[in-house]
């Protein structure tokens, strides 16, 4: 029997809550869940008792690491909320969430305004065309300033922020807000956790300013909306409903970003924020169709939210759940899916059975019989599905746009403390890498060491912590290693010839390959330019494979060789002795022979480092950047502090948090994200080669 949809599509909202670390994002989500009736007791991040942060390390560190998906209800709407981490090491979690959201709430700290990590998540949201509203939080905090925060959106994000409210008071005088659309004031009751307020006339001393801002707001809307512009120019009255509808249209087109004020911790402004989510953020019907391709014809297909269409969903997160084991979060783009039915994982071309479907409430779950288009839910029973896989109706296979994940930039060796821990560690690493595509675990074939790599020191700390807590694995950790790469800088043509005659069947493979440097980031490209069968067809894939295997261990110091074009253009073969294996070896010999003439270099990851310090420490900090082979890319004033933008090699950034803390007496902060790879200076390259026992190259 078919189940019926509880909430129509137009009354569904899939939203993310994004922010800089410490802007109060998790507390805001908590309050939303509290007021929508999902939580009976409020947990403070300060006490480590928050509903959304359900992993132990998140509660200890007071930061959100994994995006828990939670369902809430507000004024007849279903709101699926994805809580996203605000720490730079977890930007992949943010991207992963943005892929499946329709709209987002950006939370700012009312004292700091737009901070470096806000810029990162804002840029990511813009890449995915996600409409946003902004909540200026912590208005009760010392130094909070609503107008400063709104201006920081214009200046630092170049975004058209539209304040729909004015704050009544600030810091410990923050009493409520003026609604510039309704032209009313909401003043909070001091005694009952802010869950009740009085709707009153705008305070006399704010009336004139409120009217001025109301006018300015209508002008801003008219600038981006023709209907309002027409009425405005004709001098006709614009009703509140018309104004709201126009703000919604402009928000969905990313022409405007409505801004609201409040203090989640003091329970002020959260209900108005919820109203804004319903009024201004998109339903699955409002967003542009989702791109997919037909795996047989490569024809582009556009998916719309429609329950009658064939089922198509994206697995956007795999988690090991303490209660139900392996849990796959899915976003349904079209069609419906009943628990117990089969789906096709079209990415891996495997049929899978969905055992149970769960609606997630941060740490408690409700079993549901069916999911519909536009829904976000958890599925149990998908054994082969990993993050970014497409799940479709077995009779209508589709490939949804897959996710791109950055390569890890930092690596450490881990070894189990006891033999008994070895198997447990392998299981733990396998599960953790299934959950997180930017975390990789591998064994060094030469040393037998287990190496884990990730996006930063905090990222790996948390992985190691989870091994200990969730999988009870005790491990020793080595010093962090940088994920260097190798590349060619010159074009060269070389021969690789492998001949072995030792009685019986011999081995014979002979190739001529032209190697050319590829654009940075373009990776490896292989071209078959063989004419006249000088290398038989069946051996050409072996040449390609042989090159890729040899490139994995580089030519200078054992790091992967990247960004190279290889053109196989000549060679020879032996009727009896040639084999796939012989041509694989010949290809790897060609790569080795290219070292002398292709100008190989070692590339190192360069990080974008933004350092915020009080002015009096500026000179010292800039000296530190230069001493670490960094380049200062500019500075800007932030209140009485300075933001230094710089690019620094990752190898020079280990332990920098401690250095900065002592150099600025604990007042400096920095964020660091991977930016690009570039060649190391000659002296550094020589050191790396020596340390790794590699082969120095003669100039």
From Swiss-Prot:
Gene Ontology annotations of biological process type: ribosome disassembly
Keyword Cytoplasm set for record: yes
PROSITE patterns referenced in this protein's UniProt entry, alphabetically: G_TR_1, G_TR_2
Record-linked Pfam families: EF-G_D2, EFG_C, EFG_III, EFG_IV, GTP_EFTU
Positions in coiled-coil regions: none
Chain's role: Catalyzes the GTP-dependent ribosomal translocation step during translation elongation. During this step, the ribosome changes from the pre-translocational (PRE) to the post-translocational (POST) state as the newly formed A-site-bound peptidyl-tRNA and P-site-bound deacylated tRNA move to the P and E sites, respectively. Catalyzes the coordinated movement of the two tRNA molecules, the mRNA and conformational changes in the ribosome.
Record HAMAP family: EF_G_EF_2_B
Family affiliation: Belongs to the TRAFAC class translation factor GTPase superfamily. Classic translation factor GTPase family. EF-G/EF-2 subfamily.
Protein known as: Elongation factor G
Taxonomy of the source species: Bacteria, Bacillati, Bacillota, Bacilli, Lactobacillales
Gene: fusA
